[in-house]
Structure formats: C-alpha cells, structure tokens
C-alpha cells in the first residue's frame, strides 16, 4: 500500500508554491562529507526545457547548466547511490530515488527535496520499485511496473492511480507545456491485447484510488488483434483516458510527446522505424526509416518548435528527422499511392500471381511496417559512420538545403570565383570528412541506385515494396565519440540559431588545397545536446538548411572535477 510521510506538512504548500526560485548558478553551492570515490553514473537526464542536466551517481548527484553555457551549478555528496533524479525546470525542487544498495535506502522511496534550503519536503513510499518519475508544473507522475500514480505537485495529494500491464522498462511520456491551459497529457503503453470500445476501461485502466472515478467512452483507433505497440493517451487535467493510438505491432521501445502535447513520436523494439502521430486525431503524420538492422532506441525527443525529432540508439548514432513540408508531402504521396487502385488488365496466369502479390499487402495493412519495410543502415559496429550520410538525404530537395545566410557569407570569404559545380556542392548535405570510409561510399552509391530504381519502377510495384527502395530518411545525423561499448545516450535539440566558429577543414574534401587550412568559418547552427552513460556532455551543430553530418562543437566531462 502507498504510504506518505510528510517532513514539513505545515509549510508544504508554501514551499512548493515558491519553487520558481532558481538554484544557485555560481558553481559554489555544494555539500561535502564522507563519500564513495566511485563516481559511476547511475542516471542522467535533461530537465523539461533542456537548460539543465541532472546526474545521479554512486556518491550523490550533480546539477549542470547547459544554456547559455555549460557549467556545474550544484552538487551533493553523500553515502547513498542515486538511481533516479528529476528536476522541475531550473528550480530548487528535485525528485530523488535511491538505488537501495545502502542500509536504510530503498528504491521504493521517493524524496522531494529543496536544494536551496537543503531540506526534504516529503517522502513517499510505494509498494514496488520506482521505475520512472516525471514532473510538470502541476503534476508529479510516479511509474511502477504495473501502476502509475498521479499527484498534485502543489499539495502532494494523490489524485489518481492507473493500473497498467507490466511495463518493466518504465516507458511513459508527458507534455511539459509551461502554460497551465495547454495540453497536459500522459502517454504510456497499452495492454498487449485487442482493445475495443467497450472493454478499454476494464482491461487497461483502473480508476480506483483517485478523486475521479472515470466511466466514460474512449475514442479508440486500435482495431487489430495481438498488438503490443499501442499507446494510451491520458488527460492529466480531467484525469480521464482520451484515446488509444495504434503505433506499432511490436513492443514499444521509446515514446515522447512534444512539449505542447500536440505530437507523439514512437519507436518499436526493432528500432528501424520512427513514427509521428497527431495526438488530437491519432493520425500518423510522418514515418521515417532509421536503419536496416534492428537496434535499441534509447530516446526520442521533439525540438521545442516541433520541427524536428531526435533519436538516439545503441548504434551510438543520433538521427535528426525533420518534420517539414517536403517530408509531409512525401508521406502523403506514399499514402495516396498505396490507396490508388491499379488499372485492370486481361487476366493471365502470371498476372494472377501479381494480383495475389498486390492483395497481400492490403490484407496485411494492420501489420507493422517494422517487419516488412524497415530499411536503413545502422550497422555502426560493422561499418564505421554507416547510416548518417547516405544519399537518401537527397530526398529533401537541394533547393531546400540552401546554405543559411550566415553560412553563405562564410563560404564567400574563401570561395569567391568558384565554378557552378562547387557552388552547387554548397547546397548538398554537410559531410564530415573524418567519417568517410570506403564502405560508407559504397553504401551511398548503392542507395542512390536503389532510389533511382524506385523512381522508375515505383508505378509498377506494390506501394510497400517501392517504399522499401525509396524511404523517407533522416535529415541529419551525428556519431557520438564514445570511449567504450554499449554506451547509452539521450539527446535534445535547441531550436535557437547560434553563430559558431567551425574549422574550414570540416567542410572541405581531404584532397582540397584548403583542407589543411586552420581558418575558422562562422556558421549559423542549431545546437544538439547529447549526454551519455559514460558521463560526457556533447554539443553538436546542425545546419538547418543543409542537414547532413552535425559538427562537434564542445565536449565536457560530467564526472571530472577539473571540468
């Protein structure tokens, strides 16, 4: 049973109402004492607006600023391993769960602490291990393997309890809109069974334990048997389930909501397809191919302007998918093509076989495309730099990949008088010359040939076959400079253009006369922040016009005290 112990019940509401007081940012706030020397990273995450990083260690935790510039702003050292730590924006409010390896600590105990006052606001004890904690300005979400607890964050009052199917990886997502009138949604995996209009409440959601007992109709778009990749959308304001979005046939590996709650991105445990849905309608808006080979997707995140989706995976590659007009038109074209009937022809024996081939995809339309149409090239361990700079980037027209104004001015400073071919090259996706390899060049050539074949043969092939040859792929990518193997990572994107100095050699071919030049170029780039389980923070730059390979701008250690 749930047990709550308040350490400061009288002043709880007053303390939480003052959570807007920011934590110290001068680097001097820290508490020292006897502690373990092992600074192993147990947990690492960004806060809601990606302005801070929270790191759970074997000897306490650390808080870092990453905007406008990187720096440590708070540290607690103690003889307790921290398994989960979550921030509430840049405030002094933290939610902490211990690993439970030391006497007196427990992974079932959640502490709400105020770092500014160095006090514990309250403790919450749960019936099983806490797998995930999420915070918004109005709600505290605690996820166990088979329950989700919803609290009012200003009073710590339990509002609702949801019984779920086993969720051992702690998969859930929240919209984090600062505006209280915005879409306040929770997304979590649906039970692995057929969900119908009449049975959704009974099989998927138990409303006992909350202040609102929900017995209402749910708009469900799931109609396929034996699905385990559906997502339940839950309204945290009304405390009622909204809909079930049919995302994948196989089990979910990652889900995320846009900050305003309008979009949902999902990936299955196959790791080859990333999909984006409208939360309001449940309609699939985009489908992207991350790779051919199955891999583990660690995280998905939207940019704050909803123009990009960022995905990290066990391949140590980060993919950036653009939610632009050209991508939307391409997805729409494929849907239209799939629904367009083929012209009837005189029947022959050979055409009967072809007819069966055409009918089969329509009969299996409920099948997850992950099984059939997943493509890409995520063989990072076998081929270095694999899937990030395939010619599939040509799916987005070169006209849309014009250099930004700042980039154009930078190139003009040393490329004046170049011919038309070199000028056209400036509109191509950026390519990191350090990642070029023979295998990568062969891969790009083969994908170009496949794409040309798809364009010529697309009208004669069933839509599912042609979509394999002509996929919608990532707009940009980057390779993490990991030291070891099996490195986990999460990434977020800052949608504010910033002027950065980049070595000229990054943009030049190795056989170019300018490749060895030490001249720095000024480019307008979007920043992508990446943190890894090794305890490193990376800042990469993305050219929003050209895409392609992202440029490593900064690298910091979150463990090294000399940082």
Curated annotation (Swiss-Prot):
WD repeats lie at residues 36-74, 247-287, 292-331. Residues 404-417 have a biased composition (Low complexity). It is found in: Preautophagosomal structure membrane; Vacuole membrane; Endosome membrane. GO terms for cellular component: cytosol; endosome membrane; fungal-type vacuole membrane; PAS complex; phagophore; phagophore assembly site membrane. GO terms for biological process: cytoplasm to vacuole targeting by the Cvt pathway; late endosome to vacuole transport; pexophagy; piecemeal microautophagy of the nucleus; positive regulation of vacuole organization; vacuolar protein processing. Transmembrane segments: none annotated. It is a peripheral membrane protein. InterPro entries: PROPPIN, WD40/YVTN_repeat-like_dom_sf, WD40_repeat_dom_sf, WD40_rpt. Residues 329-430 are annotated as: Disordered. PROSITE patterns: WD_REPEATS_REGION. GO terms for molecular function: phosphatidylinositol-3,5-bisphosphate binding; phosphatidylinositol-3-phosphate binding; phosphatidylinositol-4-phosphate binding; ubiquitin binding. Pfam families: PROPPIN (PF21032). A motif (L/FRRG motif) lies at residues 288-292. Keywords: Autophagy, Endosome, Membrane, Protein transport, Repeat, Transport, Vacuole, WD repeat. The keyword Transport applies. Residues 366-393 have a biased composition (Acidic residues). Belongs to the WD repeat PROPPIN family. Component of the PI(3,5)P2 regulatory complex. The PI(3,5)P2 regulatory complex regulates both the synthesis and turnover of phosphatidylinositol 3,5-bisphosphate (PtdIns(3,5)P2). Necessary for proper vacuole morphology. Plays an important role in osmotically-induced vacuole fragmentation. Required for cytoplasm to vacuole transport (Cvt) vesicle formation, pexophagy and starvation-induced autophagy. Involved in correct ATG9 trafficking to the pre-autophagosomal structure. Might also be involved in premeiotic DNA replication. PANTHER family: WD-REPEAT PROTEIN INTERACTING WITH PHOSPHOINOSIDES WIPI -RELATED. The N-terminus might form a beta-propeller domain involved in specific binding to phosphatidylinositol 3,5-bisphosphate (PIP2), leading to the association of the protein to the membrane. This is Autophagy-related protein 18. It comes from Scheffersomyces stipitis (strain ATCC 58785 / CBS 6054 / NBRC 10063 / NRRL Y-11545) (Yeast). The gene is ATG18.
């Amino acid at each position: 049973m749930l047990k709550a112990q308040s350490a400061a019940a009288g002043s709880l509401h007053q303390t939480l109402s003052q959570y807007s007081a920011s934590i110290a940012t001068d680097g001097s706030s820290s508490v020292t004492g006897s502690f373990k020397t092992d600074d192993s990273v147990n947990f690492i995450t960004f806060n809601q607006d990606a302005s801070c990083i929270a790191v759970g260690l074997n000897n306490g935790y650390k808080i870092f600023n990453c905007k406008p510039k990187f720096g440590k702003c708070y540290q607690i050292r103690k003889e307790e391993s921290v398994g989960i730590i979550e921030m509430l924006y840049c405030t002094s409010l933290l939610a902490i769960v211990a690993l439970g390896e030391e006497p007196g600590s427990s992974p079932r105990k959640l502490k709400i602490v105020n770092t500014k006052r160095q006090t514990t606001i309250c403790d919450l004890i749960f019936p099983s291990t806490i797998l995930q904690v999420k915070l918004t300005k109005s709600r505290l979400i605690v996820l166990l393997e088979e329950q989700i607890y919803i609290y009012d964050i200003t009073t710590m009052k339990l509002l609702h309890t949801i019984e779920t199917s086993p969720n051992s990886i702690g998969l859930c997502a929240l919209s984090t809109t600062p505006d209280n009138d915005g879409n306040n949604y929770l997304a979590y995996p649906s039970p692995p069974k057929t969900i119908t209009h009449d049975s959704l409440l009974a099989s998927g959601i138990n409303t006992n334990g909350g202040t609102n007992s929900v017995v209402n109709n749910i708009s469900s778009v799931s109609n396929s048997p034996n699905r385990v990749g559906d997502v339940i959308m839950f309204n945290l304001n009304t405390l009622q389930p909204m809909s079930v979005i049919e995302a994948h046939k196989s089990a979910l590996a990652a889900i995320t909501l846009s900050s305003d709650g309008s979009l949902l991105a999902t990936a299955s445990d196959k790791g080859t397809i990333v999909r984006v849905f409208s939360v309001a309608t449940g309609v699939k808006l985009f489908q992207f191919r991350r790779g051919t080979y199955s891999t583990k997707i660690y995280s998905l995140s939207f940019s704050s302007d909803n123009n990009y989706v960022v995905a990290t995976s066990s391949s140590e590659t980060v993919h950036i998918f653009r939610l632009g007009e050209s991508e939307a038109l391409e997805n729409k074209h494929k849907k239209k093509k799939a629904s367009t009937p083929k012209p009837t022809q005189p029947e022959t024996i050979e055409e009967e076989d072809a007819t069966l081939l055409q009918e089969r995809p329509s009969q299996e339309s409920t099948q997850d495309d992950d099984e059939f149409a997943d493509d890409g090239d995520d063989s990072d361990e076998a081929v270095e730099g694999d899937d990030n700079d395939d010619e599939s980037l040509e799916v987005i027209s070169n006209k849309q990949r014009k250099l930004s104004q700042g980039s154009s001015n930078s190139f003009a400073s040393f490329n004046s008088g170049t011919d038309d071919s070199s000028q056209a090259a400036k509109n191509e996706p950026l390519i990191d010359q350090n990642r070029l390899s023979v295998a990568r060049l062969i891969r790009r050539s083969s994908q170009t040939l496949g794409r040309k074949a798809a364009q010529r043969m697309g009208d004669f092939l069933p839509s599912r076959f042609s979509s394999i040859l002509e996929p919608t792929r990532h707009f940009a990518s980057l390779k993490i400079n990991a030291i070891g193997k099996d490195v986990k990572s999460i990434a977020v994107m800052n949608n504010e253009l910033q002027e950065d100095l980049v070595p000229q050699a990054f943009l030049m071919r190795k056989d170019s006369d300018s490749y060895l030049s030490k001249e720095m170029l000024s480019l307008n780039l979007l920043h992508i922040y990446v943190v890894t389980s090794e305890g490193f923070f990376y800042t990469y730059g993305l050219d929003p016009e050209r895409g392609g390979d992202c440029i490593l701008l900064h690298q910091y250690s979150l463990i090294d005290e000399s940082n």
